Each structure stands twice: as C-alpha cells, then as structure tokens.
Amino acid sequence: MKYTPLYEEHVKLGAKMVDFAGFNMPIQYTSIKDEVLAVRKNVGMFDVSHMGEVIVEGKDSTKFVDFLITNDFKNLKPGEIVYTAMCNENGGFVDDLLAYKISEEKAMLVINASNIEKDFSWMKKISESFDVTLENKSDEYVLIAVQGPNAQKTLQKITNVDLEQIGYYTFTEGNVLDIKAIISRTGYTGEDGFEIYTTDKDGIIKIWKKLLNLNVIPAGLGARDCLRLEASLLLYGNDMDETITPLEVGIKWAVKFEKDFMGKEALKRQLEEGTSRRLKGFKIIDKGIARHGYKVFKDGKEIGYVTSGTFSPTLNQAIGMALIEKGYKSGEIIEIEIRNKLVKAEIVKMPFYRGSVKSKKKG
C-alpha cells in the first residue's frame, strides 16, 4: 500500500480511508454531500497525489507526444495544456490524460493512478522510434486540487503568481507560500480551480495546512467522483477502457484526424462506418441508484450497461451514464436493472450540471 505525504493530515481530520489504485486515500471526511456542496458553492481541496506524472524530454518531445495522443499537441504554445485520449491500435483507450507543454523539448503527461505502470510501458514502446527520454516521476510529484467558485480568491492569498493571468487549461511555474510549484487552471469537478504540483513533500503539507486555515473544505474521492459525474467528465475503468473508443463516449472533439496518431486508422474507419453504441446521460425517475455494470433495457430488450452512477447532491437526483445502442435520444424512457428490479430512467442531455469552470482563455 502506498501513502501520500498528506496521509497523516487525513487521519487527523477523521477521514474514512480506502484503498484506491494501491494508495490509501480519503474517501470522505464529513459527508460526501457536504463536501460536494462546499466545492459547488465555495471552495474545497483534494489530495490527488496518487495521479501519475511522466516527463518527456528530447529533440522529438513534441513530435512524440503529438503521435502518442489523439488531440493536437504540436500547435500548443509552452504553458498550454490539452485533454486527450491515448489510444491503442484498435482505437480503444489506453488512458485519458492531460498533456502539459513545458517547452518544445519538454512535456509532462498526467495519467490515471490505476494505469501508471501500463501507460509508462506503452509510452516506452512507442518512444523507441523517437529521440526522447521518458521518466516516470509519479512517486516524486505530489498534487493538491483547489476547486470551486472561490478557488482563485482563496489561492491568491498564498501565491506570488497572478492567477487572473492563468487561463483555463494553461499553467505557470511559481511559488505557493515559499514552495516551488506548477500551478495549472485545471480540475475534475466542473468548477473553476487550480491544481498545484510540487516535488516538495514537506511543502505540500504546509500548503494543505495553510489552506485549511483559510477555511478550505477538504474533500475526498467520494465527492470527487460525484462532482466529475455531475459535470459529465469521464472516469477510466468505468466509462472507458481498451475496448471503448473516444468516438463512442462523445469526445470526438479531442480526436484530430488531420494529423497522424496511434489508433488513427481504426478510429477513421469507425468515423466512416458510424459507431454502434453511444454514451448517454440518464436520470432515475423511480427510486434507486444505478452502479457500474448494471444492465439497461428498452421495451424488454437489453441495449447496454451503466458505466457510472451516483446520487447527485447538487441536483438532489440519482444520475448516471450508460453505454447503449445508438439511436436513443434525450427524453426517451429506458429501464435499468437495480437489484433484480427494473427501474425507470430518462435519457437526458449532458452535462448534468454546469459549474463555474472557465471555458474561455484569458488574455
């Protein structure tokens, strides 16, 4: 079992700890509902040090990352970030990730905790035909996410960086307190917010404690999962895996067919032929919460399965996403098998909720 440097802080706060991707992580401190609403209405923070970081350096750094991922990396300026899929030869997700362009010859790839080893060996394999070096820095970097409509106002009190200048999906290097960090305007909640990366493991504890003093609410992985689902953000292992493609889960915008990338031929073929299934949002009409793997029916016929489901504290409603046969539209009624009982649900447009997240770049 791995522990983040903030483990003892979580225990002091009375967090309920669980094993997540080999890390002992806080699932909740007070209640998932309170933590979700704190992030939606004010500001909360998450220890997300379990995330993986791979540093790519070398002459072909930009060329390599651009081929590795489906989205455009080549045309990013240093200081910009892109959300993307990383696909196998069949167009299925190896992972989804954030690619940070530090310079033309250096990048940071932020990957899911459950996929660190798999992703790194996949990247190594692809990198053999490029002039690059790859380093798995996942154990060195620690990370706090500060999220919510008041994230900027709060974080500004402890950093020398003008946060107003950091546009959505951009980053800069600077100090938080006196700790050297990468600060990016990114998150996984649907709210405005920042992620603070540092290799200073004592420093991250100082930052955490200072934010607590500023009345930032600590939030666990339970709230994080609720928030991301309300914002219709995908979770690897639930909403996508190696057998599911970006086109099936509605992120065609993150696939750039005008360039070359791993999995392009398979995805191009799928684009031409059309997908046989699509990820759709639903809200439960009857009582019950749908969970990953539950079967979905229409008029007695099985049409797919639930990928993610939860009770949304923000909407006071059970919601979820399901991968179902194509052709079903918003407003249609489907049924989900919950504990051997068919429960009615309505297909709805996503996202379920739009928060304070900035979609326009500043400046």
UniProtKB/Swiss-Prot annotation:
Identify the InterPro entries for this entry.
GCS_T, GCS_T_bac, GCST_C, GCV_T_N, GcvT/YgfZ/DmdA, GcvT/YgfZ_C, TrmE/GcvT_dom1
Any one biological process term the GO annotation gives: glycine decarboxylation via glycine cleavage system
Gene of origin? gcvT
Q: Which E.C. number(s) belong to this protein?
A: 2.1.2.10
According to the record's subunit comment, the protein's assembly and interactions are: The glycine cleavage system is composed of four proteins: P, T, L and H.
Q: Which family does it belong to?
A: Belongs to the GcvT family.
Give a Gene Ontology cellular component term annotated to this protein.
Answer: glycine cleavage complex
The UniProt entry, under Pfam families, shows: GCV_T (PF01571), GCV_T_C (PF08669)
What role is this protein assigned?
The glycine cleavage system catalyzes the degradation of glycine.
What does it catalyze?
N(6)-[(R)-S(8)-aminomethyldihydrolipoyl]-L-lysyl-[protein] + (6S)-5,6,7,8-tetrahydrofolate = N(6)-[(R)-dihydrolipoyl]-L-lysyl-[protein] + (6R)-5,10-methylene-5,6,7,8-tetrahydrofolate + NH4(+)
- Check the record and name the HAMAP family matching this protein: GcvT (MF_00259)
Q: Has the keyword Lyase been applied to this entry?
A: no
Transferase found in the keyword field: yes
Keyword terms, alphabetized: Aminotransferase, Transferase
The lineage is:
Bacteria, Thermotogati, Thermotogota, Thermotogae, Thermotogales
A single GO molecular function, which one? aminomethyltransferase activity
Name of the protein this chain belongs to: Aminomethyltransferase
Tell me the domain of life: Bacteria
